[in-house]
Amino acid sequence: MTKTNNFLPLMLDLSGRKIVIFGGGSVGERKAKLFSGCADTLVASLEFSQALQELGTSGQVRLVQLDLLTASDSELRGLISGAFLVIPATSNFELNQKITAIARENDILINQVDTLGSVVIPSVIKRGDLVIGISTLGHSPAVSKYTRKQIEGLVTPEYSDMIRLQDELRSYLKQHVAEQRERKEILWKVLESETVWNGFSESYEKAAERAYAIISSYLVNSNR
């Protein structure tokens, strides 16, 4: 197994990057759903799941119908050409290995579904602009799934609203508070305020109103 201490989590801008997924089943479908909104995603297979067909029809992914078992090396290379990442996700081990070998020859990143490749795709939780990736680097999918369930219970949809509010407050404070240390202190007061968090259950505006009240109180006490 690849040394897992060499892996580092990164957030990548995949705009315009070509992602090639081989396999139109459940695994390929899951990978395609992950990449469809942020990359030029191509899925190659003889048959496609219903969800993949819908993604193709809507233009979110490109579908290439091809019998991969009988496809020539040149056909596979043609699909892989220019790719940023290749994902061999067929049900045929030998075919996956063949695709992997071709990608490696061309120094293309690989996410292998049955072992560690050069790229590990984590389980992803999104709450607006908050993105959390979870991975055990292949050692325990069960622990990864359990961790995801725990975090999903903790990170509520209100986190997305708080990110929006904090971004708004940062801009406001830069105009009214010169010291970065003080701005940070105020933002933390808002972040740790139960009244602000509870305000989101009513509306974003209610939470924002309470946050600005905290800021006003701070500025008054600081004689600003």
Curated annotation (Swiss-Prot):
* MF terms (GO), sorted A to Z: ferrochelatase activity; precorrin-2 dehydrogenase activity
Name of protein: Precorrin-2 dehydrogenase
InterPro entries per the record? Met8-like, NAD(P)-bd_dom_sf, SirC_C, Sirohaem_synthase_N
Question: What's the stated role of this polypeptide?
Answer: Involved in the archaeal biosynthesis of heme. Catalyzes the oxiation of precorrin-2 into sirohydroclorin.
* Subunit structure and binding partners: Homodimer.
Q: Which family does it belong to?
A: Belongs to the precorrin-2 dehydrogenase / sirohydrochlorin ferrochelatase family.
Q: Coiled-coil annotation: which residues?
A: none
Q: Tell me a GO biological process for this protein.
A: siroheme biosynthetic process
Pathway connected to this protein: Porphyrin-containing compound metabolism; siroheme biosynthesis; sirohydrochlorin from precorrin-2: step 1/1
What Pfam families does the database record attribute to this sequence?
A: NAD_binding_7 (PF13241)
Catalytically driven reaction(s): precorrin-2 + NAD(+) = sirohydrochlorin + NADH + 2 H(+)
User: Keywords, A to Z?
Assistant: NAD, Oxidoreductase, Porphyrin biosynthesis
Q: What is its EC number?
A: 1.3.1.76
